[in-house]
UniProtKB/Swiss-Prot annotation:
PANTHER family: CHLORIDE INTRACELLULAR CHANNEL EXL-1, CHLORIDE INTRACELLULAR CHANNEL, ISOFORM A. Expressed in the intestine, neurons and muscles. This is Chloride intracellular channel exl-1. Probable chloride channel. Keywords: Chloride, Chloride channel, Cytoplasm, Golgi apparatus, Ion channel, Ion transport, Lysosome, Membrane, Transport, Voltage-gated channel. GO terms for biological process: chloride transport. GO terms for molecular function: chloride channel activity. InterPro entries: Glutathione-S-Trfase_C_sf (IPR036282).
Length: 238
């Protein structure tokens, strides 16, 4: 079993991870695998993307997120999304049958991005995807997507869904409808999970991430500075 470091872009304080849901997903995935394999050893490191540390440069990685792994005295690096996810797929436990769950969630993030970027001015398509997820969850007899325990796909969907929830409220004054009770119960189950909470960025970092993307609503310099100065908030209740 290799020892590895997960490198993530630092957030506004140059210490804690940024609010990118992909970074949150990878952090949670690593915690998930570590929970199931006590021999697995990894750490999480951050650095400013605009002024990377010498330690990061020494790994040979050129971008983040990335993984630097040590095995038998040799160092390997993984920095494309496909390479990182392929590396994680070799870790225990094996992936379960999550094809139906993938089908129920595959368009949710894309439709939210279209909504928040005003490609879609109405929330209709986004709501349709949330309803699709709610229907899928209503037909399951499990706390999570395919099991009563977190699996690979939950690490992806929960982190995205939380990012969506926080950003939608701040940037579009949108809240997940109360009648989508299965989606809200799913989020509650995620929020009660230690690996989710440990890996989760603050609400402020999530908002900063979204407002720095192309075509998304921008914050004024004053509002951005206010967010950075605030005590970190973690919205773990719905």
């Amino acid at each position: 079993m290799p020892t590895f470091s997960l490198w993530l872009p630092a957030g506004s304080n140059n210490v804690h991870p940024c609010g990118d849901p992909y970074a949150h997903h990878l952090f949670m995935r690593c915690l998930y695998h570590a929970k199931h394999d006590p021999t697995m050893k990894f750490d999480v490191k951050t650095t400013n993307v605009n002024k990377t540390s010498q330690e990061f440069k020494n790994t040979g990685l050129r971008r983040m997120p990335g993984i630097s792994a040590e095995e038998s005295g040799e160092t390997q690096t993984f920095e494309t999304e496909d390479d990182i996810l392929d590396f994680l797929e070799y870790l225990k436990p094996e992936r379960g049958d999550d094809e139906e769950a993938e089908n129920a969630t595959c368009d949710l993030f894309r439709q939210f991005a279209r909504f928040v970027k005003d490609v879609e001015h109405r929330d209709t398509a986004f709501n349709t995807e949330l309803l699709r997820l709610d229907k899928y969850l209503s037909e399951q007899e499990t706390k999570f997507l395919i099991s009563d325990d977190v699996t690979h796909i939950d690490c992806l969907v929960l982190t995205r869904l939380h990012s969506i929830r926080v950003a939608a409220k701040m940037l579009k004054n949108y809240e997940i409808p109360a009648d989508l009770s299965h989606v809200l119960d799913y989020l509650k189950a995620g929020y009660a999970t230690e690996m989710f909470r440990v890996s989760c960025p603050s609400d402020q970092e999530i908002v900063l991430h979204w407002t720095e993307l192309k075509d998304t609503p921008r914050l004024s310099a004053k509002d951005r500075a206010k967010l950075v100065r605030e005590e970190p908030v973690f919205s773990f209740s719905v």
